[in-house]
Amino acid sequence: MSAPKVQLLLTGNELMTGDIVDSNSAMMAQVLKDIGLGVNRKVTVADDLALLVNEITYMASTSDILIINGGLGPTVDDLTAQALALAIEDELSQHPQALTHLTNWCHQRGAELNGPNLKQAILPKSCQIIANKNGSAVGFYVRFNHCDIYCTPGVPHELETMLIKQIVPAISADLPSDLITDVTRLQVFGLGESSLQKIINEQLPQWPTAIDLGFRAGMPLLEVKLTTNTKKGLALKPIWHNKLADVLGDHLISEIQDKPKSLAEHLLHQLQQHNLKVTTAESCTGGLIASKLTEISGSSMNFEAGYVTYSNKMKTAMLDVPAKLFEQYGAVSEQVVVAMAKGSLIKSTADLTIAVSGVAGPNGGTEEKPVGTVWLAWGSIDNIKTQCLLLPYKRVKFQEFVAAIGLDLLRRYQQNITSIPNYIAERAFTDQ
């Protein structure tokens, strides 16, 4: 039996004008793909009742599953419930379950349950409620002829929770028993999508068509998906999974088991296994590396201290960086960042450290050290490694990448990985 036909209908004037970028359809497509369903049509329409009725009528007649996104709010341009009722020739009525949810939602927040809010409880009479723990608007479901229609909120995190926790399980329960869905997700760092695709094309040119290979760019990790919906693909997958892992090498962080983990989580896990403590010495990142480590529950077992020494004066006062190094080499230099790393280890009782000093911009760059230049030092007191990079990003993105690279370098160090990837464009100061 073939897979059900899935279509998406998104509504909102903001989507049509570009005031809001549509990320919901991409997320829905990814989640549905994980259960073996592809989206064969997506339509975006303005908040226009006639347009919505026409699209719902047509899409419900040409699909097995229709997910409508947006238009569930309390304002005059939220038209999904009304349009659906007209399309399926149903009546609108106040739904008791939706009203109870709305009443509780307003009461918990000290808000007034007024006329506009009550609109969110006026739904097609035949619908079933889909609970929304994250917002005031419930979702709802109707079966119309051969089509299952799900109406969902436009707020991304409300949609994602509803989709994953309720809609996908409901869809999965009705899928054909012979429909195979097998998905493996890998986390990769230090390679971009185009670079990775080039490597795969060169080293794995015979990649089987039975296994779909997909990429999902993140910040900072890249997710690689191996998906198959056939018995042939299921048989081939372990072989090609291993081949891909070999090609990825030490860029492969992990296989995602439940939910993705951050670089900081992976590093802390390694430190916990070996009962090691880490410290940080940061200048250009302003404590971001320490923040990423300490936002994880249980990090106090392995995180010793974080030194944010933004000025040269405080680098000397807190980490004993010799003042002469600033005069001779500048704050953004290998000599200074090594001194910061050693100082952080001496001042604390940590076993490992990561230290960074760079030019985050947009000002402060020179011909010798342009904006985006950063020196990193990491390791233990008797084995400090260094690297200099030029990261051509705006300030916030620069800081994010420096923090991620610092965590990855320490991960590699702890795993005894001697190779250091050229994360983007390595600088070599031959005059020092």
UniProtKB/Swiss-Prot annotation:
NCBIfam families this protein is in?
Answer: cinA_nterm, PncC_domain
Q: Which SMART domains match?
A: MoCF_biosynth
Q: What InterPro entries does its record include?
A: CinA, CinA-like_C, CinA_C, Competence-induced_CinA, MoaB/Mog-like_dom_sf, MoaB/Mog_dom
Q: Which SUPFAM superfamilies match?
A: CinA-like, Molybdenum cofactor biosynthesis proteins
Coiled coil ranges (UniProt) are: none
* Name under which the protein is recorded: CinA-like protein
What PANTHER family does the record point to?
NICOTINAMIDE-NUCLEOTIDE AMIDOHYDROLASE PNCC, NMN AMIDOHYDROLASE-LIKE PROTEIN YFAY
Recorded family membership: Belongs to the CinA family.
